[in-house]
C-alpha cells in the first residue's frame, strides 16, 4: 500500500469510487451548480497543471531524461518529453525534428484542456465532468490521441473514456445534457464537425426532456452566427427521421434575424429542411409562413400537393378494394371477434381521424387556389383574344386604305382636264407653263355639213381609244390625231398630255387643227 501512496494514486482511486455519488449530491444541493460556474475552470486549470508537473518530474526521474520539447498553448508554455507525447499522432508528426510547437487556431484547444491531455499521455487519471468532457473529446479528435499504457498494461483510449462517460452519465441526465449542449455551442464548429456531439445531445434531450428544455435550447441556438447555426441545423437533420424540430429551430432563427439576413442566407438555412419529413400541420404552417424565403414556400406547396394527391389515391384504392362480399364480411367479423380493442388502437384511430380532417382542410384550400388560378387564366385568355381581334381589324383597315390609295393612283394615270372658257390660262412661255410637256389646242365646234347621229361622249371615248391603239405603223400618227379629234369633238378646250413617243401625234393634231380652222 506504501508503493501506491508514493505513486500518488490513493486520492485518485478514492475520487473514482465516489465519483457518481459526488456529482449526484452536487446536483441535488443546488441548481446553480449545473451551470457553467466560474469556479469550475479555476479548479480545472490549477489541479491538472500541478498533477502534470508532478508526472513530468516522476517520468524524468524514472527514465533519467530531461524534458526536451516546448509546447505553447494559449499563452502557456509546457516543458515536456517527446516520447510520452508520441501517443498523439498530431504531436508526433509536428515534433519530428523540432523542439518547440505552438498550438494555435484553428485548433480550438485551451491550456487547461491540453494539460489534461498531456497528463493522460504521462499516465495520469483524468476526472471527467460535464464541463470538460466536450473539450477533451474535441482534443482527442484533433490531436489524434490513441491509447496510453501504465506499467505495461494497455489502458482504454481517451476517446473511449469520453464516449463511455457521455453514454452512461451525461445522456441519462437532463441537467448534464444542458451543460454539455452549452459547451458544444461555445466550441462550434469543432464540437460537431469532429465529435458529432450536438445532434446526439439534442436527440437525448428530446427523449428524456420536456418542452421547457427544448425551448431553452432554442433560445441558445437563435443567438448563434449564421455559419454556426448551419452546423447545428445539419446536425439535427442527420439525427432525426422527422424534421419537425428542425423546422421549429429554423423558424425561430429566421424570425429572430429577419432584418439581418439576406434572401440567399435564408435559402441556405432552409435547405436543411426536407418538406417530405414535415408533419401536415407544420407543412401547412410552412406554406403560410411569410418569414420563409419564397423558394422554400414553393417547395412546401408542391409537397403539400403531393401529399394530398397521395391521400386521395389511397382513399380511392381502399374504397375500391372494400367490396361488399359475404366472405369478406365474415372475415372482418372473425378478425373483430379475435382482436381485442386496445387503448393504442383507439389512439391510432383518433389520430387517423384528425389527420383526415387536416388533409380535407388542406385539400379544400388547394381546390380554392386552383379555382382562382383557373379564373385568372380564363380572364387572360379573353383579354388576349380581344387584343388579337383588335389587331386583325386594324390590319384590315390599313390594307383597305392602301388599296384605295393604289386604285386612285392608277385612275390618275390618264387625266383629262376640262377648262371653262372664262378662266385665264397660262400662256405658252409664261412662268409655270408646261409647253415642254403638253400641247394645248383650242377649237370651236363646227356645224356638221350633213346631219349625222350624235354619239355620246363615252362611246366616242371608247372608239377613240380603239382607233388610237390600232396596229398600223404608217397610219398611227394620222389615226391617233383623228382619234383625239373625234374624242374631244364637242369640247372647246382640252389639254393633251404629251409623252416622249407622242411627238408625231402632236404635230399631226396641230396641222389638222390649222386646216380645220
Curated annotation (Swiss-Prot):
GO terms for biological process: protein ubiquitination. Gene3D superfamilies: Potassium Channel Kv1.1, Chain A (3.30.710.10). The keyword DNA-binding does not apply. Residues 224-307 form the NPH3 domain. Disulfide bonds: none annotated. Pathway: Protein modification; protein ubiquitination. Pfam families: NPH3. Transmembrane segments: none annotated. Residues 28-37 have a biased composition (Low complexity). Residues 28-49, 409-456 are annotated as: Disordered. Residues 67-130 form the BTB domain. May act as a substrate-specific adapter of an E3 ubiquitin-protein ligase complex (CUL3-RBX1-BTB) which mediates the ubiquitination and subsequent proteasomal degradation of target proteins. The BTB/POZ domain mediates the interaction with some component of ubiquitin ligase complexes. Belongs to the NPH3 family. This is BTB/POZ domain-containing protein At3g49900. It comes from Arabidopsis thaliana.
Amino acid at each position: 500500500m506504501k508503493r501506491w501512496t508514493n505513486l500518488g494514486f490513493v486520492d485518485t482511486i478514492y475520487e473514482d469510487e465516489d465519483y457518481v455519488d459526488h456529482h449526484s449530491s452536487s446536483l441535488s444541493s443546488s441548481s446553480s451548480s449545473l451551470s457553467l460556474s466560474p469556479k469550475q475552470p479555476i479548479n480545472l486549470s490549477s489541479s491538472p497543471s500541478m498533477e502534470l508537473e508532478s508526472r513530468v518530474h516522476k517520468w524524468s526521474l524514472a527514465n533519467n531524461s530531461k524534458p526536451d520539447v516546448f509546447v505553447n498553448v494559449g499563452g502557456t508554455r509546457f516543458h515536456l518529453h517527446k516520447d510520452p507525447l508520441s501517443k498523439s499522432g498530431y504531436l508526433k508528426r509536428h515534433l519530428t525534428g523540432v523542439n518547440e510547437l505552438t498550438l494555435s487556431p484553428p485548433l480550438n484547444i485551451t491550456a487547461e484542456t491540453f494539460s489534461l491531455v498531456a497528463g493522460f499521455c504521462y499516465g495520469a487519471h483524468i476526472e471527467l465532468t460535464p464541463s470538460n468532457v466536450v473539450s477533451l473529446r474535441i482534443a482527442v479528435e484533433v490531436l489524434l490521441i490513441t491509447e496510453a499504457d501504465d506499467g505495461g498494461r494497455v489502458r482504454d483510449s481517451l476517446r473511449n473514456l469520453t464516449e463511455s462517460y457521455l453514454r452512461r452519465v451525461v445522456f441519462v441526465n437532463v441537467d448534464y445534457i444542458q451543460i454539455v449542449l452549452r459547451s458544444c455551442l461555445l466550441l462550434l464548429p469543432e464540437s460537431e464537425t469532429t465529435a458529432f456531439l450536438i445532434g446526439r445531445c439534442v436527440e437525448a434531450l428530446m427523449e428524456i426532456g420536456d418542452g421547457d428544455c427544448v425551448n431553452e435550447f432554442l433560445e441558445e441556438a437563435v443567438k448563434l452566427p449564421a455559419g454556426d447555426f448551419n452546423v447545428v441545423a445539419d446536425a439535427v437533420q442527420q439525427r432525426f427521421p422527422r424534421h419537425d424540430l428542425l423546422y421549429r429551430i429554423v423558424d425561430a432563427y429566421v424570425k429572430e434575424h429577419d432584418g439581418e439576413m439576406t434572401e440567399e442566407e435564408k435559402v441556405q438555412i432552409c435547405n436543411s429542411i426536407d418538406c417530405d419529413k414535415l408533419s401536415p400541420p407544420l407543412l401547412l404552417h410552412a406554406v403560410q409562413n411569410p418569414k420563409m424565403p419564397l423558394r422554400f414556400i414553393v417547395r412546401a406547396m408542391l409537397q403539400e400537393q403531393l401529399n394530398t394527391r397521395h391521400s386521395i389515391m389511397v382513399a380511392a384504392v381502399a374504397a375500391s378494394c372494400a367490396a361488399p362480399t359475404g366472405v369478406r364480411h365474415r372475415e372482418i367479423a372473425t378478425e373483430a371477434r379475435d382482436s381485442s380493442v386496445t387503448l393504442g388502437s383507439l389512439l391510432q384511430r383518433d389520430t387517423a381521424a384528425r389527420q383526415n380532417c387536416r388533409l380535407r382542410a388542406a385539400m379544400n384550400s388547394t381546390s380554392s387556389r386552383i379555382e382562382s388560378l383557373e379564373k385568372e387564366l380564363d380572364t387572360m385568355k379573353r383579354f388576349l383574344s380581344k387584343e388579337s381581334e383588335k389587331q386583325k381589324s386594324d390590319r384590315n383597315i390599313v390594307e383597305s386604305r392602301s388599296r384605295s390609295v393604289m386604285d386612285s393612283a392608277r385612275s390618275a394615270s390618264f387625266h383629262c382636264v376640262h377648262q371653262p372658257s372664262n378662266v385665264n390660262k397660262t400662256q405658252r412661255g409664261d412662268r409655270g407653263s408646261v409647253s415642254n410637256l403638253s400641247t394645248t389646242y383650242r377649237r370651236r365646234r363646227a356645224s356638221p355639213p350633213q346631219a349625222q347621229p350624235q354619239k355620246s361622249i363615252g362611246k366616242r371615248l371608247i372608239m377613240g381609244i380603239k382607233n388610237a391603239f390600232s396596229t398600223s405603223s404608217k397610219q398611227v400618227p394620222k389615226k391617233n390625231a383623228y382619234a383625239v379629234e373625234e374624242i374631244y369633238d364637242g369640247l372647246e378646250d382640252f389639254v393633251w398630255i404629251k409623252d416622249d413617243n407622242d411627238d408625231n401625234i402632236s404635230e399631226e393634231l396641230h396641222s389638222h387643227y390649222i386646216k380645220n380652222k
